[in-house]
């Protein structure tokens, strides 16, 4: 069977499985998720062995450190995946819930019911944990899903796929509800993008090149998990000691992830006191500063002059753009020009400035006096996420179970006819 036929067959089987899954009981779905958590714990050694094969191949191919970090599984990350399974299992099941109702003058009772999106195709790179997160969220929301991970994670993804299949079968749910593409041929992506008859929405999660390619090729709606060019604005009068720790966490904890900080905008009033403290705190961790002319002398030996192309750059590394700004207007203008609608934060003591920043900074999460690293489904209480949408339709921000459903109108009558 050639690739086109193989992918079309997967789409047909996903559509059939999705119809069954949409009618599945909450107990059956929760049972599959709980069993998957147990399997992840019991089969940890096999998962780590598969991941080791991927890591060895990636190292031989010269993969850079940030991508290696995203590829790597550990006992701790497997424990986190198991915990996410149990957390999502315990969440309220949205499918079939009638969220709101109102009565019309003619007596009709009108409501909106939560329903699955249908069949989702997920295309992603490097991260094996996305295989589990995507599967459990789609399952909970009643969606079938076709998962196409990166070739660099193929052994890890297939090992996890086997556990998902086992968990589904254990409670009588269709194994085809979650399918992982087993071939690494990149032609698969183009074939998935053609299947509008069988796939309702496609979600690319990865580098800018992948996302643009999917947007260009897809015949169905695309929910984009675009790059994370995240900024922090240090307001006049901010708590500088607190801000230093926020910036350190946002940049240094995991510099290769999409909610890591990439740009630091500092009010001119605070630059002389704040930037040397930042240089000392972050410089000890090897952060390189790409600095504007005004900030360069305040950052010491760790700073180099910024270039125009550094604006809007997702560095995925221990590199931070630094600019001094005159006021919030200039900070917001920079964010509007170079941000990616992902995450923006402000450090301030001024409530009015905080509320203005929340209103005017255009991003899927805007935070006051907190790290950008909190833009994450688990951290925001969603249990897990299939991605962080930077598109405002159909969802904006981390996509959990609720965001993988839509609504339909339901009407209760007593024989009414339209006049």
Curated annotation (Swiss-Prot):
Signal peptide: none annotated. It is found in: Cytoplasm. Its EC number is 1.2.1.41. Pathway: Amino-acid biosynthesis; L-proline biosynthesis; L-glutamate 5-semialdehyde from L-glutamate: step 2/2. One of its GO terms (molecular function) is glutamate-5-semialdehyde dehydrogenase activity. The keyword NADP applies. It catalyses: L-glutamate 5-semialdehyde + phosphate + NADP(+) = L-glutamyl 5-phosphate + NADPH + H(+). Disulfide bonds: none annotated. Transmembrane segments: none annotated. It is an enzyme of class 1 (oxidoreductase). Keywords: Amino-acid biosynthesis, Cytoplasm, NADP, Oxidoreductase, Proline biosynthesis. One of its GO terms (biological process) is L-proline biosynthetic process. Gene3D superfamilies: Aldehyde Dehydrogenase, Chain A, domain 1, Aldehyde Dehydrogenase, Chain A, domain 2. GO terms for cellular component: cytoplasm. Belongs to the gamma-glutamyl phosphate reductase family. NCBIfam families: PRK00197.1, proA. HAMAP family: ProA. Catalyzes the NADPH-dependent reduction of L-glutamate 5-phosphate into L-glutamate 5-semialdehyde and phosphate. The product spontaneously undergoes cyclization to form 1-pyrroline-5-carboxylate. This is Gamma-glutamyl phosphate reductase. It comes from Nitratidesulfovibrio vulgaris (strain ATCC 29579 / DSM 644 / CCUG 34227 / NCIMB 8303 / VKM B-1760 / Hildenborough) (Desulfovibrio vulgaris). The lineage of its organism: Bacteria, Pseudomonadati, Thermodesulfobacteriota, Desulfovibrionia, Desulfovibrionales.
